[in-house]
């Protein structure tokens, strides 16, 4: 009886994390990449560029993400959120010099961040297993696919000039 109880306590793989061995390796890689590359680059970026410039760059990319949030809000039937995102984009793109200045926040127009992973969840797509993505960190299979779609539909990805596209991608990551 004791022998059977001991065997009964042996655990198999966690059903919510069937990719655990791979996830652990990717997490170790991400930790190393963060320590060796990403953090030093971010520190230099912070030391070289004044706060106002960094804020403007962040606002610019935030304005671009508001465009996709608008479409995802519509797809999730969140019409009020879609309207607010449309107002944010209109105000920040025109009055905010292409989004560099975030007037919409100053005007108390709430940001409603929605992505394609959330849209798939809204329409009943299950999350799938937990996965750790290189450089991006923890996610689910559904949200990983959503991240791929978000990236492919990103405004910057539509640029033909590879150097400009790569520069904007690098700036967004910092």
Question: What are the roles of these predicted feature ranges?
Answer:
Residues 20, 118, 123-174:
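A structured, mid-to-C-terminal "fold-capping" secondary-structure block
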Residues 14-44:
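Post-signal peptide N-terminal segment of mature Sec-exported envelope proteins
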Residues 12-13, 74:
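Helix-boundary and loop/linker segments of multi-pass membrane transporters
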Residues 63-141:
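Mid-length scaffold segments of soluble, non-membrane domains
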Residues 36-73, 93, 98:
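Signal peptide-directed extracytoplasmic domains
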């Amino acid at each position: 009886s004791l022998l059977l109880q001991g065997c009964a306590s042996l655990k198999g793989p966690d059903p919510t994390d069937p990719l655990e061995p791979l996830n652990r390796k990717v997490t170790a890689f991400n930790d190393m990449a963060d320590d060796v590359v990403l953090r030093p680059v971010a520190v230099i970026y912070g030391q070289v560029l004044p706060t106002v410039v960094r804020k403007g760059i962040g606002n610019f990319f935030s304005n671009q993400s508001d465009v996709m949030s608008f479409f995802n809000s519509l797809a999730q039937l969140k019409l009020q959120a879609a309207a607010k995102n449309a107002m944010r984009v209109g105000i920040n793109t025109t009055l905010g010099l292409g989004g560099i200045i975030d007037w919409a926040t100053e005007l108390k127009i709430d940001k409603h961040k929605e992505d394609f992973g959330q849209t798939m969840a809204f329409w009943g797509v299950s999350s799938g297993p937990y996965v750790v993505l290189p450089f991006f960190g923890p996610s689910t299979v559904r949200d990983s696919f959503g991240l791929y779609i978000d990236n492919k539909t990103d405004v910057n990805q539509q640029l033909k000039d590879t150097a400009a596209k790569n520069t904007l991608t690098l700036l967004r990551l910092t």
